[in-house]
A protein has these predicted regions:
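Helix-start (N-cap) detector for alpha-helical repeat units in TPR-like alpha-solenoids
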Residues: 26-27, 60-61, 94-95, 128-129, ...
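Structural signature of tandem alpha-helical TPR/SEL1-like repeats
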Residues: 39-47, 72-85, 107-119, 142-160, ...
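TPR/TPR-like (Sel1-like) alpha-helical repeat modules
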Residues: 135, 139, 154, 265, ...
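Bacterial N-terminal signal peptides
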Residues: 12-22
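N-terminal leader/linker segments that initiate helical-solenoid repeat arrays
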Residues: 24-55, 60-65, 72, 306
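Structural marker of alpha-solenoid helical repeat scaffolds
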Residues: 55, 89, 123, 164, ...
C-alpha cells in the first residue's frame, strides 16, 4: 500500500512538472517578445510572440503584444484584428484600449477611434495623449458621426490637457483650430501665440497664426509671421500660398507673385495657388500668363470633381 501510494505521488509530481513546463515556456516566449518589442527589435519580437500565442490563443496579454508588434511593423490589418480581440477579451485593460485607439487614430479611422479612445480615457483619465487623440478624432469624424456638440467635446478634452500640462505639445494649436472653425479669430490668436511661445519651431502653428492675422486685417504682421514659417518649412506649399495672399493684401504685388510662383513650384497640383497667381498676373497687366494659370486652375478643378 505504501509503495502504491509512493507511486501515485511520484506520478502526480511528474504530471505537475509536465503541466508547468509549457506554461513556463509560454511565459519565457512572452517575456522575450516583450523585451525585444521594448528594444524596438520588432522582427525578432514577432516570432517569439507567435510562439507564446500558439499555445494560448485566448490570452489577451499575448494577443495585445502580438498586435502591438504588428502595428509597429505597419501591418495594420492584422494589428487591428488582434488589438480589437484583446480589448474585447479584457475590456478593463487601459493599455489595450489605448493602443487600439491609437492604431485607429494612426490609420485615420477617426469615427471608429472615438468610442475606443473614450474608453481609454475613462480607464486612465491622466492619459493626456489619449485625450489629445480623442479631441482630434471628434473633429475629423464630424462629417461621418454628425455629433452636434463636437466642438464642446473637443474643447473639454483639450482644456483638461491644458489644466494638467499647459506645455503639452500641440494643445494650444488644436484649441486655436477649434476657435478658427467657430469664427473666433481673436481667441485663436491668443492660443497660437501661446503655442509658439512654448514651441517656436512649430511651422504649422505659425502658418495658422499668419492666416489668422490676415483675417484680422493685420497684413504686414501676417507677412512677417509667414516669412518666418517659410524659413522654418521651405517645402510647405500652403505657407507660400498664404504668404502670397498676405503680400497681395499689403499691396506688395511683386512679392506676392514670387510667393505664388513658389507655391505652384512646390506643388504643381495646388489649384488655388494657380488661381491666385492668375489674379496676380491680371493685376500686373500680364494677360497671357493670367490666362495660362486660370486654365491650369480649371483643369485641376475639373480633374478633382470627376
Amino acid at each position: 500500500m505504501r509503495r502504491k501510494w509512493s507511486t501515485i505521488e511520484f506520478t502526480r509530481s511528474v504530471l505537475a512538472v509536465c503541466l508547468v513546463l509549457p506554461a513556463f515556456a509560454q511565459q519565457n516566449f512572452y517575456q522575450s517578445a516583450l523585451d525585444k518589442f521594448q528594444q524596438k527589435q520588432y522582427e525578432e519580437a514577432l516570432p517569439l510572440a507567435e510562439r507564446a500565442l500558439a499555445d494560448d490563443r485566448n490570452n489577451p496579454t499575448y494577443i495585445h503584444l502580438y498586435g502591438a508588434i504588428l502595428a509597429a511593423m505597419d501591418q495594420f490589418y492584422l494589428a487591428e484584428e488582434n488589438l480589437r480581440k484583446a480589448t474585447t477579451l479584457a475590456p478593463n485593460e487601459r493599455a489595450f484600449a489605448y493602443d487600439f485607439g491609437a492604431l485607429l487614430h494612426r490609420e485615420r479611422k477617426y469615427a471608429e477611434a472615438v468610442p475606443v479612445l473614450k474608453r481609454a480615457v475613462a480607464l486612465d483619465p491622466e492619459n493626456l495623449t489619449a485625450r489629445m487623440m480623442l479631441a482630434r478624432s471628434y473633429v475629423f469624424s464630424f462629417h461621418e458621426l454628425q455629433i452636434p456638440n463636437f466642438e464642446e467635446l473637443t474643447l473639454e478634452q483639450l482644456r483638461y490637457i491644458v489644466k494638467k500640462d499647459p506645455r503639452f505639445p500641440g494643445v494650444h494649436h488644436h484649441i486655436a483650430l477649434v476657435y478658427i472653425n467657430s469664427g473666433e479669430p481673436a481667441k485663436a490668436l491668443e492660443e497660437l501665440n501661446t503655442e509658439l511661445q512654448f514651441y517656436p519651431t512649430n511651422a504649422q502653428a505659425r502658418l495658422e497664426l499668419g492666416e489668422t492675422l490676415l483675417k484680422l486685417n493685420q497684413f504686414h504682421k501676417a507677412a512677417e509671421e509667414l516669412r518666418a514659417a517659410a524659413q522654418q518649412a521651405p517645402q510647405m506649399a500652403p505657407i507660400a500660398f498664404a504668404l502670397a495672399k498676405a503680400y497681395r493684401a499689403d499691396g506688395q504685388t511683386a512679392k506676392a507673385v514670387d510667393a505664388a510662383r513658389r507655391c505652384v513650384e512646390l506643388d504643381a497640383n495646388f489649384a488655388d495657388g494657380h488661381y491666385l497667381l492668375s489674379q496676380l498676373y491680371r493685376d500686373a497687366n500680364q494677360p497671357e500668363q493670367a490666362r495660362e494659370e486660370l486654365e491650369r486652375f480649371r483643369q485641376l478643378k475639373g480633374a478633382s470633381s470627376q
